[in-house]
Amino acid sequence: MYEGPVQDLIDELGKLPGVGPKSAQRIAFHLLSVEPPEIDRLKNALQRVRDGVQFCVVCGTVSDKEHCRICADPRRDRTVICVVEEPKDVQAVERTREFKGRYHVLGGALDPLSGVGPDQLRIRELLARIGNQEDGVDVSEVIIATDPNTEGEATATYLVRMLRDFPGLTVSRLASGLPMGGDLEFADELTLGRALSGRRTL
């Protein structure tokens, strides 16, 4: 163990997803070796994220405004909603350049063992968006793009059951091709784009 502030920095870095003890130590000593202005830029970026980032009131993705740039864009197709688990999944789908509709971020996936049920996700908000129309336009399709793992499949199954009550609504799921057990954010653009364009109706 290192002394005082150095060990504190390593401990805090080690709490980040995907950062183990050795990586935390390597990052900490990198930060100790850089010039003060670089540290200041990192500190300011963290401060701006803490103070200026919020969640879009419509779709739930991260934004620096009340409405994210996608929800505020009148050119996006309001009749199609792509449902994803996390804001990072929005960026994964956007990179494909295949989807021109809007998104809905659930904020996770169903995981009873971790205490995550329907009430902990933004499912009620999704149903309200469809039931109340999207800016006065009927939603015609919901694409379920949850991760291809146990929790994602359970979430997709639950959503299909909830969405069946809406007459005329098409519910689809990304086509096979994504590796089972993986995360949407790690899929390459080509594979994810093909899964999106080849989606199957449920």
Curated annotation (Swiss-Prot):
Which SUPFAM superfamilies does the entry mention? Recombination protein RecR (SSF111304)
Zinc fingers (C4-type) by residue = 56-71
Q: Does the keyword Zinc-finger apply?
A: yes
Parts of the chain that traverse the membrane: none
Q: Has UniProt tagged this entry with the keyword Ligase?
A: no
Which part of the chain is the Toprim domain?
79-179
The GO molecular function terms of this record are: DNA binding; zinc ion binding
Q: Which UniProt keywords apply?
A: DNA damage, DNA recombination, DNA repair, Metal-binding, Zinc, Zinc-finger
Biological process annotations from GO: DNA recombination; DNA repair
Q: What does this protein do?
A: May play a role in DNA repair. It seems to be involved in an RecBC-independent recombinational process of DNA repair. It may act with RecF and RecO.
Family statement drawn from the similarity comment of this UniProt entry: Belongs to the RecR family.
Entry protein name: Recombination protein RecR
Species this chain originates from: Rhodococcus jostii (strain RHA1)
